[in-house]
Curated annotation (Swiss-Prot):
Keyword annotations of the record: Cell wall, Disulfide bond, FAD, Flavoprotein, Glycoprotein, Nucleotide-binding, Oxidoreductase, Secreted, Signal
Protein name: Berberine bridge enzyme-like 2
Signal sequence residues: 1-20
Principal subcellular localization: secreted
Residues of the FAD-binding PCMH-type domain: 76-250
Length: 536
């Protein structure tokens, strides 16, 4: 009889467990709101524009406001149960504490430029912590420093610096709508990389909310965690609130230019020589190379464009490149002298940068989201002319593929690869693969994603190997995603070493120390050490 009762009990327990379901959305919302209210000591009616369930009128506008890739803005795209539109540090603390208590995944979004939508998409129940309201910027010209909120855009950062000082800038990206939190924590680079290095090279302090909901500065978090969030991707370790950055000097006059050639106009010669000049010339000169298949005179060809910033006057750069890079064919009419802040606008595709006001940089949403896919590579040895001819042929075959070559060298090659988690400093240049399309639907998406993979395979002989390095801020889920189970570390190690090289080991140790339960997790977050307990 006792055995029979035990069997009935076990069967009943099994059925109860099997039929257990996730609490309904309203229950999740009420539980979260109650916790959030308790943590912030705020009356519930004051949080109507902060804690947004799917039924809230502001839910969809806030969620969509910073979705920069149309691939992830469809009816089929997974949506969070709640969006937390934080307006204070206490809101961020409460978001971490309360989401953790409900055992729900938390995604943190600053600017929404993650190429794979990792900051606002998941395939398990999740909340989105939107940081766009935490964008305060305080610039102190006397100390040549600034505090930058994680939700600020790079355009806002540049504008606020210019507002206070005309002789300083900051080495970061050329797209003004990119969020500072994600950009800097992934390393951050722009057109002053050869002169000054990465954005993280100028971070002197930071504020982060850790897994326990505590606000920590550099001293509070310790040097290991500070090292990790400066290039290792902050979302694996906590929620970045702000970075303190050191400003860099910029001259009163800079020069920009653009030179374009196609294959008939000896673009191959120009591209080949670019590899020998761009990474080795004056550190104050950054020459980005853009490659794109186009049609000219009813013939398919490849257009090669050199787009440049020189921290000096046009006569100096003209004299320099006439000697070093005659294949470019730079002419005086290609060059425009302007101020540094005007060059920021010029690089943001404003050809009339000398006529428009810098306030345009405060526009957080000027660009329309298109469908896109990105990949990246690093090059250690110059590609031969035969190799370039092969790649040009494949670009024409694939169509719609764009390549962006960003030269390194300069100060980059003088910095140890372990100074920050970013390990790629000694490379000649970085390549961004860009695939954009306008056609909605799964058929078009499948086709273009396959084309992106195909071209990535064509590039393999010419780039780094074992591992094939790639850039964390050019997120690519094709190279691997985290999976639960006993092999989770080994799976993460594959893409982790592609992003971070040998620095991956130190990142894992830091992660295990500061977030042993793996609360801050996503598709490509840093894993904990094998054998350590982790959330699933």
């Amino acid at each position: 009889m006792k055995i029979f009762c035990l069997i009935l009990f076990l069967i009943s327990s099994f059925i109860s467990t099997s039929l257990a379901v996730e609490p309904p959305p309203e229950t999740i919302y009420q539980n979260f709101l109650q916790c959030f209210t308790n943590q912030t000591k705020a009356p519930p009616n004051s949080l109507a524009d902060v804690v947004l369930p799917k039924t809230a009128a502001a839910f969809t506008p806030v969620l969509r406001a910073y979705i920069r890739n149309a691939r992830f803005n469809t009816t089929a795209t997974p949506k969070p149960a709640i969006v937390i539109a934080a307006r204070s540090e206490s809101h961020v603390q409460a978001a971490v504490i309360c989401t953790k208590s409900l055992n729900i995944q938390l995604k943190t979004r600053s600017g929404g430029h993650d190429y794979e939508g990792v900051s606002y998409i998941s395939h398990v129940p999740f909340f989105v912590l939107d940081m766009s309201n935490l964008r305060n910027i305080t610039v102190d010209p006397a100390t040549e420093s600034a505090w930058v909120g994680a939700g600020a855009t790079l355009g806002e950062v540049y504008y606020r610096i210019w507002e206070k000082t005309k002789s300083h800038g900051f080495p970061a990206g050329v797209c003004p709508t990119v969020g500072a939190g994600g950009h800097i924590s992934g390393g951050g680079y722009g057109n002053m990389i050869r002169k000054y290095g990465l954005s993280v090279d100028y971070v002197t302090d930071a504020k982060i909310v850790d897994v326990n909901g505590q606000v920590l500065d550099r001293k509070g978090m310790g040097e290991d965690m500070f090292w990790a969030i400066n290039g290792g991707g902050g979302a694996s370790f906590g929620v970045i609130l702000a970075f303190k950055i050191k400003l860099v000097p910029v001259p009163p006059t800079v020069t920009v230019f653009r030179v374009e050639k196609n294959l008939v106009e000896n673009a191959t010669e120009m591209v080949h020589k670019w590899q020998f000049v761009a990474p080795k010339t004056d550190p104050g000169l950054f020459m980005r190379l853009l490659l794109q298949p186009v049609t000219r005179n009813k013939m398919q060809t490849v257009r090669a464009s050199v787009v440049a910033l020189f921290l000096g006057d046009q006569n100096t750069v003209m004299s320099m490149l006439t000697k070093e890079f005659p294949e470019l064919g730079l002419k005086k009419e290609n060059c425009t002298e302007m101020t540094w802040i005007q060059s920021v606008m010029w690089w943001a595709n404003n050809d009339n940068a000398t006529q428009i006001k810098p306030e345009i940089l405060l526009d957080r949403n000027p660009d329309m989201a298109t469908f896109g896919k990105r990949k990246s590579d690093f090059v250690e040895k110059e590609i031969t002319k035969d190799g370039l001819d092969f790649l040009f042929k494949k670009m024409i075959e694939v169509g719609k593929i764009g390549l962006v070559f960003n030269p390194y060298g300069g100060i980059m090659s003088t910095v140890a690869t372990t100074k920050t988690p970013f390990p790629h400093r000694k490379k000649l240049y970085k390549i961004q693969h860009s695939m954009n399309w306008k056609d909605p639907g799964t058929e078009a998406e499948t086709s273009f994603l396959q084309k992106a993979k195909s071209f990535y395979s064509y590039m393999a002989p010419f780039v780094t190997k074992n591992p094939r390095h790639t850039y964390i801020n050019y997120r690519d889920l094709d190279i691997g995603v985290n999976t639960p189970g006993p092999n989770s570390y080994r799976v993460a190690e594959v893409f982790g070493r592609m992003y971070f090289g040998e620095n991956f080991d130190r990142l894992v140790k830091v992660k295990t120390a500061v977030d042993p339960q793996n609360f801050f997790r996503d598709e490509q977050s840093i894993p904990t050490l094998p054998g350590k307990p982790a959330r699933r």
